[in-house]
Amino acid sequence: PGTYLQDRYEILSLIGTGGMSEVYQAKCHTLNRLVAIKVLKDEYSQDANFVSKFKMEAQAAAGLSHPNIVSVYDVVDEGSLHYIVMELIEGITLKSYILKKGHLGVKETIGIAIQVAQGLAAAHDQHIVHRDIKPQNMIISRDGKVKVADFGIARAVSSQTIGVNAVGSVHYISPEQAKGNYSDG
């Protein structure tokens, strides 16, 4: 907190931590708005492979503009510091929401699923496959809007990229992928 990035973004607080990155709430003083900043962890910032994957996430998501997808505003490399500036969603992950409520009714579940499907369809229309769909990567805003986040292992799909590699979180990949069979991305 209190740290500035690019003399523009003031870090306010840590929102969450993932395997490769930490996400902070920040204030953009140029546009006078709150944003989320996803920072690649230090232990990965010198690894060209991780830096490349991190940039690919930003590039995959940056071209997507849809009410059910978290918007990417900027991607920045400052020496060994790599970060993505994104839309800040005031809310909680679908995983936290489910744990908090304990049970979701059919109507609510369908409403959430429709919003997720609309976001994924918009990504697919741009030939982007998310490849890591799980409750932790869905954010529900305070007003009930569901947004797909974390395109970290997304892939631009063409006939050359369709393969048999299993990619995703082990608890959420399809049985076909787990067996090493055909996968569309």
Regions found by a protein language model. Name each.
Residues 112-113:
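Activation segment signature within eukaryotic-like protein kinase domains
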Residues 27-34:
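Conserved N-lobe loop of protein kinases adjacent to the ATP-binding glycine-rich P-loop
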Residues 41-63:
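AlphaC helix of the eukaryotic protein kinase fold
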Residues 118-128:
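Protein kinase catalytic-loop region centered on the HRD/HxD motif
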Residues 75:
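Activation-segment/catalytic-loop signature of the eukaryotic protein kinase fold
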Residues 12-18, 23:
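Protein kinase glycine-rich loop
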Residues 79-93, 97:
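Conserved short submotifs of the Hanks-type protein kinase catalytic core
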